[in-house]
């Protein structure tokens, strides 16, 4: 299935690229999410007419993400939980916990924008957590987990 991308998608293409995707991926994810349209003659003509407006919207989204990244660049989060003597937490620190801690510092970050490489944090220590604000804007935020 050929689709026209309406925004940049990692490992697939940029705005305006005509790419071949699996039918289920296009039909069930890209098209309903508004990330792509089916590549037929009519949609190609419509896209050519709307391309400048779409590029402007994408540039604004990138600028907003860069501004959020600049504000988050020096953010450090401290989360205190009960832990055993060996440093293992009674529970874990997940996406929602980190998102809530960032919100307490005044940074609105959705839990879907946070990437934990090895799953939830289950030990005391400091951990870099990847925050994915835009396909072109990612940064690491340090999370310090300490004993309560």
From Swiss-Prot:
One of its GO terms (molecular function) is structural constituent of ribosome. One of its GO terms (cellular component) is ribosome. Keywords: Ribonucleoprotein, Ribosomal protein, RNA-binding, rRNA-binding. GO terms for biological process: translation. It comes from the Bacteria. InterPro entries: Ribosomal_bL9 (IPR000244), Ribosomal_bL9/RNase_H1_N (IPR009027), Ribosomal_bL9_bac/chp (IPR020594), Ribosomal_bL9_C (IPR020069), Ribosomal_bL9_C_sf (IPR036791), Ribosomal_bL9_N (IPR020070), Ribosomal_bL9_N_sf (IPR036935). It holds the Pfam family Ribosomal_L9_N. HAMAP family: Ribosomal_bL9. Binds to the 23S rRNA. Belongs to the bacterial ribosomal protein bL9 family. This is Large ribosomal subunit protein bL9. It comes from Acidithiobacillus ferrooxidans (strain ATCC 23270 / DSM 14882 / CIP 104768 / NCIMB 8455) (Ferrobacillus ferrooxidans (strain ATCC 23270)). The lineage of its organism: Bacteria, Pseudomonadati, Pseudomonadota, Acidithiobacillia, Acidithiobacillales. The gene is rplI.
């Amino acid at each position: 299935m050929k689709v026209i991308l309406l925004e940049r998608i990692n490992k697939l293409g940029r705005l305006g690229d005509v790419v071949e995707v699996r039918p289920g991926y296009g039909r069930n994810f890209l098209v309903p999410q508004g990330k792509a349209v089916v590549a037929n003659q009519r949609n190609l003509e419509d896209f050519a007419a709307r391309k400048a407006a779409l590029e402007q919207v994408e540039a604004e989204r990138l600028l907003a993400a860069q501004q959020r990244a600049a504000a988050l660049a020096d953010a450090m989060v401290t989360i205190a939980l009960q832990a055993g003597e060996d440093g293992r937490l009674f529970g874990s620190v997940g996406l929602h916990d980190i998102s809530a801690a960032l919100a307490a510092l005044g940074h609105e970050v959705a839990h879907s924008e946070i990437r934990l490489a090895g799953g939830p944090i289950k030990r005391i220590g400091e951990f870099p957590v990847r925050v994915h604000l835009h396909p072109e804007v990612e940064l690491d935020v340090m999370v310090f987990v300490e004993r309560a």
